[in-house]
Amino acid sequence: MEVFQAFLSGIPLLQIVGDVDHFTAPALEEAAREALALDRGCLLFDLSAVPYLDSAGAGVFLTLDSQMAPGFWVGAIGANANLLRIFEIVGLGSRPSFRIFARTEDACAVLSDTDS
C-alpha cells in the first residue's frame, strides 16, 4: 500500500493505492493522524485504487470516526462495492461523521457548500 497526501479545496486528501490490511493499516493510521493534525475540519480518503480492505483497515476508519471532534467528518471517495459493503457492516455507512462519495466532484460540491 502507498499513501499520497494532496489537498482538495484546502482539505487533506489521502490517496491510497493498494490493499489496506493487517500489515498496512498502521501506516494508513499514521498518515491519517498527521493529516488530522492540520485541523481542517475533515479528512478525505481517495479509495478508488484500493481493491481490498480487511478488518484492520476498517478499524482505522472506525477509530478515526470515533475520534472526530463535533462537526468534523471523514470522507471516503471512490470506494468499490466490497469496501462499501464493509463500511455498512461495521456501521460507518450510517454515521453522519462518515461520508461516502462516489466521485471527487461530489466531495468538492459538499466542500463548496460548507465554505458558503
List the model feature ranges, each with a label:
Residues 22-97:
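Amphipathic alpha-helical interaction surfaces in cytosolic regulatory modules
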Residues 15-16, 46, 94, 113:
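Generic detector of low-complexity/intrinsically disordered segments
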Residues 97-107:
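Short acidic-hydrophobic, aromatic-tinged amphipathic segments that line or gate anion-handling sites
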Residues 1-30, 49:
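STAS-typified acidic loop motif
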